[in-house]
A protein has these predicted regions:
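Outer membrane beta-barrel
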Residues: 82, 86-90, 94, 122-133, ...
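Inward-facing hydrophobic residues that define packing positions of alpha-helical scaffold repeats
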Residues: 75, 88, 133, 150, ...
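C-terminal functional modules
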Residues: 306-381
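Aromatic-rich carbohydrate-recognition surfaces in CAZymes
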Residues: 61-68, 115-141
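Short glycine/serine- and small hydrophobic-enriched flexible loop segments
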Residues: 72-79, 128-139, 198-205, 269-276, ...
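Solenoid-repeat scaffolds in large eukaryotic assemblies
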Residues: 71, 83-84, 146, 153, ...
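Internal amphipathic alpha-helical repeat/solenoid segments
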Residues: 27-70, 75-97, 102-118
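Extended ligand-binding clefts on enzyme/binding-domain cores
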Residues: 2-30, 34-37, 42-43, 61-65, ...
Length: 381
């Protein structure tokens, strides 16, 4: 495997553009407080008893592995260990599956009282859980039991790769042949926004030693896949894709998923963070510039639409326009040129979202805020 060099400096794009550090720090602190401890109209972190708490998907009124793992990542990046442990404890108490073909995975959706809505996992939750746990180990050290963060991360990743090797033990979350993450374990297609090569690079250092070559190859494979999934002019990708990058629309669903829509917004932010941490793929900067040009010049700043990946506008409005603004800004970690500054300043002037759809938008908002301030960091073991 190629040697991995961890970053020693994290860009503070806000400071580069002249924002005062005290102002940046206050924005981060206020954002955390609003999401975790604001009034009922704004927060979506909910303590449920001693040492337990959940993140609510306010648009769907449930608790998802996506949101719980996002919350844990936000907590470790902002040094809030008590909240991290409360979320992780809720996950292990209510979401962890101990029996059946999905044993070792997490039920992707539960009701706020912990009742499972599903008995299957969604792989984006598992990969974020593992990464957040490794960072917790690096930042705070490990405890015992479920708070032996690094051991728990390795257990999750072992399940992700090795389930199904024995009959009746379920399916893996990564295709063992092409090294690409699946949308769900039983489907042979993917979601471009699930591809986190920067995480896999770190897994290649910290996962079970026997699996480290797989994770190194997964990082390479995901970077190559994203070239195929993103449109060569607009930089956009679909929510779901075949392994060759072709947009994919599930035949068993009424809603289209071959468009630039909710899940897809995360993809450009993920690639920008990969570029900021490792700089392994210069194409990521080129693609970020294409996407910003599409939104800033072709669309003249509009972020509330629905588009084919070639930029064709469709009827309807985006459910999560603030998420688009946030991820367009995070793309500036990779992009250069005048549109990078425009996107960051537009984001800085955008408030957190109110209303029932605030969960997804405000999670991506907080990630972008941390990334653009140099506060979304690797916490090495």
């Amino acid at each position: 495997m190629a040697a991995v060099t961890l970053p020693t400096h994290y860009r503070n794009v806000f400071a580069e553009l002249g924002y005062a550090q005290a102002e940046i720090d206050a924005r981060i602190e206020n954002t955390f407080h609003t999401i975790f401890y604001g009034d009922e109209a704004h927060r979506f972190y909910h303590p449920t008893g001693p040492g337990l708490a959940y993140i609510e998907d306010t648009g769907n009124h449930d608790v998802r592995t996506e949101g719980m793992s996002y919350g844990m990542m936000l907590c470790v990046q902002t040094d809030h260990k008590a909240e991290f442990d409360a979320l992780w404890s809720w996950v292990m108490h209510y979401m962890y599956m101990q029996d059946g073909p999905n044993a070792g995975y997490f039920a992707w959706s539960c009701q706020p009282d912990g009742t499972p809505n599903a008995n299957g996992p969604a792989p984006d939750g598992e990969e974020y859980f593992a990464m957040a746990l490794f960072f917790a180990a690096g930042r705070w050290g490990c405890g015992s039991g479920i708070y032996d963060y690094a051991a728990m991360a390795r257990c999750i990743l072992h399940s992700c790769l090795h389930k199904g090797e024995k009959p009746g033990t379920g399916r893996p979350m990564w295709d063992p042949e092409n090294h690409l993450i699946k949308f769900i374990t039983e489907c042979d297609f993917t979601d471009p926004s699930y591809h986190l090569p920067h995480f896999y690079t770190l897994f290649s250092l910290w996962a079970d030693e026997a699996d480290r070559p797989f994770w190194a190859e997964a990082a390479r494979a995901s970077r190559a896949f994203l070239h195929k999934a993103c449109h060569p002019v607009t930089g956009l990708c679909a929510e779901y894709s075949l392994y060759d990058g072709t947009p994919h629309n599930r035949s068993d669903r009424d809603q289209r998923h071959d468009l630039y829509y909710s899940d897809a917004y995360r993809t450009i932010a993920n690639m920008a963070l990969d570029y900021a941490w490792f700089g392994a793929d210069p194409w990521q900067a080129e693609n970020a510039e294409r996407l910003q040009k599409f939104f800033c010049e072709t669309l003249c700043g509009r972020t509330n639409g629905i588009w084919e990946i070639d930029g064709t506008s469709l009827p309807g409005e985006a459910l999560h326009p603030v998420a688009i603004t946030a991820t367009n800004a995070q793309a500036s970690l990779a992009a250069g040129g005048p549109n990078a500054e425009v996107c960051v300043r537009r984001f800085w002037n955008t408030p957190l979202r109110d209303g029932p759809r605030r969960y997804y938008d405000n999670c991506l908002y907080f990630f972008a805020l941390l990334a653009l301030s140099g506060r979304y960091r690797i916490w090495p073991l």
